[in-house]
């Protein structure tokens, strides 16, 4: 078995590490650098440049130089975040046939984000092969903890395109914890990993413990924002420079791709310089020209001004920390150490915000650019058997479930559940004689299915026709160690089964992910009322169904006056079910239960046989199995 390399596939930079002599080691690329820019360029003569070579020529070839494509993986072109990026990058973002966000070269060639990422992975693979002197085919690749199923699949696809068998997808904060904690002594402790990279933000609360001589890393909770990172900080600086230049010269540089690329490089440099100095000067001669001649950009930027420009971005990263702590059932005082990961954490304002929130200074002995790759290499070593006595227990970031009767989202696996995991639940049909059901798989935190992210739909056909509520359909969710979901539905009577590896059409947008949790908090009361209304409707539907069956069975044996009262109560309840008044539905249900009980008693007395009315009783409730029933849902056009 060859080496399993560890790769941090970053938005801005990527890093490669291996296990050597039982310890992680970062491998320098062909240029001698320990990190590689995640940039790919296509030249006029057909050459593909990757890393520093691509970055060097970006100013002269902006429309064919692709960076930060990790922010596009698993996203639809129509996503608000993608639309926001359209005018902020010099290259073209386009819509693929399935609605996904792709990129296009100046001559119109369309490329998937996975293809661009694969070029970066190919360079990392070759770097490893040159260093090791042997072929490398296996890797552990990191992703943001808040990446969803689609984005994880896309990352695996990028690895496959690059010729790598991706043995494991591992969350970036978890990898950083592995790198930090593997050799640390001192007993059990809880740490927070604050990971603010080039394009994404994650925070994970992790417990490191010694269990029977084995070092165990257990993720207690994770949260994040898949569209917050250093690129957003750079954009604030770019916007400021563009606005200042526009005020001074009356020229909007946003319409000039060449100027935009120069501004991006200058903004990034200025941001980095201001981490160690109080003031810098952005000087870009010949940035553009008009009828009066060439124009030069020369603007002073202070650290205080930069901090004011990005203040809301820094504050935006603190709320996920609060949620993660709450989900873990901890207070800030319970966290012994805070680890900073990602290049953007070098900014003093970010470090101060983290220190203020957690009430302790974050550790400075972890390299924010290399820790994630080292952790990936350690996980590769565990899989290959080179690293012993390490157990990693990660979690799924969002709840997973299906849509059930009444538009309810029924959770099968809760968020922050340790993976790999498997869970199943038994459901039933909503209609008499129903021979097929549609399983609608969703991801999110809202009670109402329509507010969650649709991941996939598939049909289970061939169900033996039977009265509603009788078929037993077992739906199973299986999340593997990569966080990738497999769903199956099985008719327990016929043993007919349908399995699917969920491959979503796109990833979750930033606003969708954040709002899933935020809206769940804000709409908790609304969701509770909706849930109660659906339960009342479902109970009423079951009561109507069982009462009609009782009329059919016993109607000829009892008086017409009683049947008339039952029919009248049925009509009133059927009308109430069409409305949204839970109290009225419950009141009409109670009335029907009472007259249906009279029907049952009359039929029993008539027959003098005790149990022939079973199933028609007023208290005939919807079977427990049917509390969350299937309804056939038509494919929407998300």
UniProtKB/Swiss-Prot annotation:
It holds the Pfam family HSP70. Induction: By stress conditions e.g. heat shock. Keywords: ATP-binding, Chaperone, Nucleotide-binding, Phosphoprotein, Stress response. The modification Phosphothreonine is found at residue 200. InterPro entries: ATPase_NBD (IPR043129), Chaperone_DnaK (IPR012725), Heat_shock_70_CS (IPR018181), HSP70_C_sf (IPR029048), HSP70_peptide-bd_sf (IPR029047), Hsp_70_fam (IPR013126). It comes from the Bacteria. One of its GO terms (molecular function) is ATP-dependent protein folding chaperone. Residues 598-621 are annotated as: Disordered. PANTHER family: HEAT SHOCK PROTEIN 70KDA (PTHR19375). Acts as a chaperone. Belongs to the heat shock protein 70 family. This is Chaperone protein DnaK. It comes from Xylella fastidiosa (strain Temecula1 / ATCC 700964). The lineage of its organism: Bacteria, Pseudomonadati, Pseudomonadota, Gammaproteobacteria, Lysobacterales.
